[in-house]
Amino acid sequence: MKLSSLCGAAALRTAAVTLTAMVSVTLLGGTAVATPPKSAAVTSITKEGRTWHLKVYSPSMDKEITVDVLRPADDSKPAPNLYMLNGLDAGEGTASWKDRTKVLDWLADKQVNVIQPIGGRGSYYTDWQNPDPVLGVNKWRTFFTEELPPVLDKTLQSSGRNALTGLSTSGTSVLQLAEAKPGLWQTVAAYSGCAQISDPAGQQYVKLATELWAGGNTVNMYGPASSPLWQDNDPVVNAEKLRGTLLYISAGSGIPLMRDVQLYQSEAPGPQGVVNLGLGMGIEAAVKGCTVNLKNRLDSLGIPATYQFSPVGTHNWPYWEDALHESWPLLAQGMGIAS
């Protein structure tokens, strides 16, 4: 199947243009270094009120990953896990659910463990074929589908039901992860993600995001453009694997409101704010084209999903915060809790 025939190629090319503009533990103060566990395990827990800061050893990446968990309102009984993935920055900076929204406060009274992994900048949370000189070893698909879930279930005494959310680049990742491990997450919500990655325009989108912004090399991710791994990891091509998962998929139009103008100017006053607004408009317009193509593919397969196509909206956090609120009933349904 050639996605270029489906693709809003002009929109994706617009996105390409807009995107262009081991922790060592010492023993008893000595010099000996603890041997890391051979299997995935929590190596430390720091509790800060209801927030638990976990260090989870990943055998596939041979390093510890920080995973922050907001415990449920009532932790005396099992609760489901809501995985909330950040975007391209992967929570390593301040571009995160925690720092750019109030969703953690909003979720504080919900009977759910809110899972916030930190790390994986520029990786698309996938399994890279080779170590990258800049981004290192990336085996995030293995981590999220095989290593982390059983560790969390054991540590948190969770209910075994899960939901997964992602925005921007991780809006692509959550669909890939759901296809890699059908049934692990009962609900998946993708906000402003470009699902098609294997046609030339989609490849360019991924390439510019990972290479231009994060400094990695997508050849180390999926190989050259001719590699079949691009199609193997394309959520649109593999959409049949989403059957049976509750899906919430949203995108804006790229048309700004006055609040967008004010937001971008508050973040970067002057000409840079204008440039950033243009980027947010162009990227979101392209994302809408991707999302329409995903909808067409799911419709052709008879796979239901809940869609939110906003007539306005740029590629920025207030819209993703709104989308989380709007998708909450479906997320709660999948996790088996009251909405």
Where are these regions (language model features)?
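Non-catalytic cap/lid and distal C-terminal segments of serine-dependent acyl enzymes
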Residues: 2-3, 12-339
